[in-house]
């Protein structure tokens, strides 16, 4: 069985998150604890259809959690701030799926492993995802700027540019290197949105 620290080291460090660091830390801990007992769950499950489905459901839930963590470590900071409410839902979905998966598996594994599942479920009950107030405010400010831009056209008003610059600074985009990284992340996001024909994201 893998050690929790070993799984966590291979997956995610809190410093990897460009934004929503506390939520990433909580989800990463959740992911690592379940992943550390997953081989035991897989080995102990019944070879029935229900057992296979339960393990598959839990595996899918873990993959969803991993995707969210990677999203927050690779995506644009500006986008993560603007789409904060959507990102919050992205965290809630794998948490709920992991809980459901553990409950299914709990009924088909030996008592000793079922107890480990229950311990994790008890911990999950105490996990409450919430947006960082500062990041949420920056996102609101950026949305306001974008809405003003749509109403006024392609404005180059100095006060708007300064406000945008301050938002970037509050998100930690303070050097030319960080600005370049952000531009690359935005470019990838726009290219993906165009490929998916996602006009809202674009």
Task: Explain the meaning of each model-derived region.
Residues 1-47, 101-117, 123, 134:
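N-terminal amphipathic alpha-helical segments
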Residues 18, 201-202:
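Extended, alpha-helical interaction "stalks"
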């Amino acid at each position: 069985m893998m050690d929790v620290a070993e799984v966590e080291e291979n997956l995610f460090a809190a410093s990897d998150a460009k934004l929503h660091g506390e939520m990433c830390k909580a989800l990463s801990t959740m992911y690592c604890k379940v992943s550390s007992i997953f081989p035991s769950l897989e080995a102990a499950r019944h070879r029935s259809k229900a057992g296979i489905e339960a393990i598959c459901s839990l595996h899918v839930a873990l993959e969803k959690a991993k995707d969210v963590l990677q999203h927050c470590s690779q995506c644009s900071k500006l986008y993560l701030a603007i789409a904060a409410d959507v990102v919050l839902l992205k965290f809630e979905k794998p948490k709920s799926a992991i809980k459901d998966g553990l409950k299914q598996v709990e009924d088909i594994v030996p008592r000793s492993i079922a107890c480990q599942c229950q311990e994790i479920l008890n911990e999950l009950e105490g996990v409450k995802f919430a947006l960082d107030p500062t990041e949420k405010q920056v996102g609101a400010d950026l949305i306001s700027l974008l809405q003003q831009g749509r109403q006024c056209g392609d404005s180059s008003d100095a006060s708007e540019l300064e406000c945008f610059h301050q938002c970037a600074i509050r998100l930690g985009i303070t050097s030319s290197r960080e600005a370049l990284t952000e531009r690359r992340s935005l470019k990838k996001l726009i290219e993906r949105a165009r490929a998916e024909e996602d006009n809202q994201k674009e």
